[in-house]
């Protein structure tokens, strides 16, 4: 994967107005207040859907979320099952951690169940709001901690951005998060990559960065699949050899044993 340029983008302007719109959306959806006839929708549809799932499951925004770690025996199973994911992601996580060092954001890698399997970046363990979401084995699924970029990326299967009060719980409204799902060489979701800041300036452009990094991790997972032949695909006019390539792993008998998402988009029948 190519190096990641240190990120110094300017924070998004209009922060207080945006937070006010989110606050009105919370009152309307989470507390049932009637929206005015001229009120413009302040939420992405998938955020409102997530909020309503949380409400339907008995969660309430004023309650304290359960930042629990999975039991030791279950964690051992997660570690064994996700060893390849952690190894494939580590080089990208390390480069990403350096690239976002000056942004007050840090990186979290989870498995497909939303359990933290690795982290990187400037992580202040003295801040409990940081510590509870960066412990290896922390369960950050929607069922446990409500609407977050982690749960949303895993459910929606697409890159997402959430800012402050777009998270479900009042206690998680300090976070701003970008997330992207990770797909393995079998085409199934293997986990997700998250960038989180606490009381940080809104940077929705981080969704693009996390998506690029997720692509690199997916390619590393595919390249790690045993193969006798690796086929690279790209469109006319594109140069082969970068992270946009479609990757096909083929065994000695000519059977395809794995493919990255780009290859599956180019060849839908895979």
Name each model feature, range by range.
Residues 1-144, 148-161, 174, 183-257:
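Intrinsically disordered, low-complexity terminal regulatory regions
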Residues 163-172:
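Membrane-proximal, non-catalytic sensory/regulatory domains of signal-transducing membrane proteins
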Residues 267-269:
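Glycine-centered C-terminal helix-capping/turn motifs at helix ends
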């Amino acid at each position: 994967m190519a190096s990641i340029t240190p990120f110094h983008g300017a924070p998004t302007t209009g922060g207080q107005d945006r937070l006010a719109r989110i606050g009105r959306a919370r009152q309307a959806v989470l507390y049932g207040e009637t929206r005015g006839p001229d009120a413009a929708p302040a939420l992405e549809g998938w955020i409102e859907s997530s909020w309503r799932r949380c409400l339907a499951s008995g969660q309430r925004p004023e309650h304290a979320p359960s930042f629990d770690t999975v039991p030791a025996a279950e964690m051992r199973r997660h570690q064994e099952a996700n060893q390849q994911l952690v190894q494939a992601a580590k080089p990208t996580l390390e480069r990403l951690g350096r690239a976002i060092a000056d942004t007050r954001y840090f990186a979290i890698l989870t498995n497909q169940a939303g359990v933290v399997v690795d982290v990187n970046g400037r992580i202040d363990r003295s801040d409990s709001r940081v510590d509870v979401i960066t412990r290896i084995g922390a369960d950050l699924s929607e069922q446990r901690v409500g609407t977050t970029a982690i749960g949303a990326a895993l459910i929606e299967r697409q890159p997402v951005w959430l800012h402050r009060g777009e998270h479900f719980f009042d206690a998680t409204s300090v976070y701003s998060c970008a997330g992207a799902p990770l797909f393995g060489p079998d085409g199934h979701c293997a986990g997700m990559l998250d960038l989180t800041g606490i009381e940080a300036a809104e940077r929705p452009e981080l969704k693009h960065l996390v998506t690029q990094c997720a692509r690199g991790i997916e390619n590393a997972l595919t390249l790690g699949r045993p193969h006798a032949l690796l086929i690279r695909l790209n469109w006319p006019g594109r140069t082969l050899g970068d992270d946009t390539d479609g990757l096909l792993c083929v065994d000695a008998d000519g059977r395809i044993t794995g493919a990255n998402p780009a290859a599956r988009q180019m060849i839908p029948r895979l």
